[in-house]
From Swiss-Prot:
PANTHER family: CHROMOSOMAL REPLICATION INITIATOR PROTEIN DNAA. The keyword ATP-binding applies. This is Chromosomal replication initiator protein DnaA. Belongs to the DnaA family. NCBIfam families: DnaA (TIGR00362).
Length: 463
């Protein structure tokens, strides 16, 4: 498969001018040229989901652009990289998408949550837009599905059910759909509510004989975004009314997006018919972000705040807060506030005691590991991360890789990057060799322990 092609490059340039930036970045840019023979343009996409979406929504657009460039009829076909790699054992064919996108703003029209566009005020968080969402392996599927329903509501995934733990970005994605929808269609009626609000509105309407107004509020919308649906648990009458609301919107072709901390089948005391309705579209889960995604989130937040954070500080914060994004961003905010109030520099040494009192004296960064190892074995840091195969250097490098794996939260590929761009398999081999020697070679065991003592990484939480 060719990495690039002049014709496809020109077609992409033309499409970039004619499509919105989110659409181009999400669907067109990831497509790679495969071949162009006898008027047949074959493109490779990251996965089945992208292939299907391009085929249904962009085939004609791409063909017209290609015909304009080539001067003759062109037919486009899409092949999934997933299928090419024979990766058919994946549990979900839409679980991998290379998506980068942007979006904008929104307005809604009724009561506190459904407001007229001209009022400029609304209940959706202005920060919760697609361009501020950092996509990682943990959230690619959910992000792609959210963008898909934002672009074409009521078609592919209805309802879209986003599930995941607290603080992982469910509400962000849900509200981003609302922002995007009204940016595309200013007259769209978008309603975002929590399940508790839905239940409270229902109770109030019953007490005040206002069911007509209640039904009008919830069933006249084009897009219903309902958060924390797990709170329907055990509320029989609320479930009954939500079932009716769901059916009314679905039958009218309106889009429904639901968020929950668990899949529909795991919500206790939820009616089977609701479980069935919630499962008839797409269930997309969001997992906790890995270290690389957490670092990307912090970097993006720093850029938004126009701050320049040292890489080792970003690594430190990302390594200490791994459970959810909310805690991660809270730690960033505290670090910035602390530095501002005290006048101390934004460094690991100054920020660590505030974020993690137990980390005083045991903060380990990749640079520190490399320095301690190079000093201990009396080789230069440059030589340690080089490709030198001299035995003293290669042995020191293997121990350095082992200690970096033990003392930091970096993945194998990232450790390889720290050691001059080594492949992750090289890092894995080095770690395995050191682990074997620890039990068979007292000299190596002593060397490793001495450097550990210098770094004080035995007391770190991940050991």
């Amino acid at each position: 498969m060719q990495a690039a092609n002049p014709i496809w490059a020109e077609v992409q340039q033309l499409l970039q001018k004619n499509l919105s930036k989110p659409s181009f970045e999400t669907w067109i840019r990831p497509a790679k040229f495969n071949c162009f023979e006898n008027g047949l343009l074959t493109l490779i996409t990251p996965n089945n989901f992208t292939s299907d979406w391009l085929r249904k929504n962009y085939s004609e657009t791409i063909e017209k652009a290609a015909e304009e460039i080539c001067g003759h009829n062109v037919k486009v076909v899409f092949k999934s990289e997933t299928n090419i790699n024979n990766n058919s054992n994946s549990s979900d064919s839409v679980s991998q998408q290379n998506i980068n996108s942007q979006s904008k703003s929104f307005s809604i029209n009724q009561s506190n949550n459904l407001i007229n566009r001209s009022k400029k005020s609304h209940s959706l968080n202005t920060r919760y837009v697609f361009k501020r969402f950092v996509v990682g392996p943990n959230s690619r599927m959910a992000h792609a599905a959210a963008l898909a329903v934002a672009e074409s509501p009521g078609r592919e995934f209805n309802p879209l059910f986003i599930c995941g733990g607290v603080g992982l970005g469910k509400t962000h994605l849900m509200q981003a759909v609302g922002h995007y929808r009204v940016e595309i269609d200013p007259d769209a009626k978008v309603l975002y509510v929590s399940t508790e609000t839905f239940s409270s509105d229902l109770i109030q309407s019953i007490r005040k004989d206002g069911m007509h107004a209640f039904k009008n509020k919830y069933r006249s919308v084009d897009l219903l975004l309902i958060d924390d649906i797990q709170f329907l648990e055990g509320k029989e009458y609320t479930q009954e009314e939500f079932f009716n609301t769901f059916n009314a919107l679905y039958e009218a072709g309106k889009q429904i997006v639901i968020a929950s901390d668990r899949p529909p089948s795991q919500i206790p005391k939820l009616q089977e018919r609701l479980i069935s309705r919630f499962s008839m579209g797409l269930i997309a889960d969001i997992q906790p972000p890995d270290i690389e995604t957490r670092m990307a989130i912090l970097q993006k937040k720093a850029e938004q705040e126009r701050m320049n954070l040292p890489r080792d500080l970003i690594q430190f914060i990302a390594g200490r807060f791994s459970s959810n994004i909310r805690e991660l961003e809270g730690a960033f905010t505290r670090a910035v506030a602390f530095a501002s109030i005290t006048g101390l520099p934004m460094t690991v040494q100054s920020i660590a005691p505030m974020l993690d009192p137990n980390s005083v004296g045991v903060v380990v960064t990749p640079k520190q590991v490399i320095k301690k190892v190079s000093d201990f074995f009396e080789v230069s840091a440059e030589e340690l991360v080089s490709s030198s195969r001299r035995k003293p250097v290669s042995q020191a490098r293997q121990i350095g890789m082992y200690l970096m794996r033990q003392g930091t939260d970096l993945s194998l590929p990232k450790i390889g990057d720290e050691f001059g761009g080594k492949d992750h398999t090289t890092v894995m081999y080095a770690i395995e060799q050191v682990e074997k020697k620890l039990s068979s070679d007292p000299n190596v065991a002593s060397q490793v322990q001495k450097i550990k003592d210098l770094l004080q990484i035995d007391s770190r939480k991940n050991l």
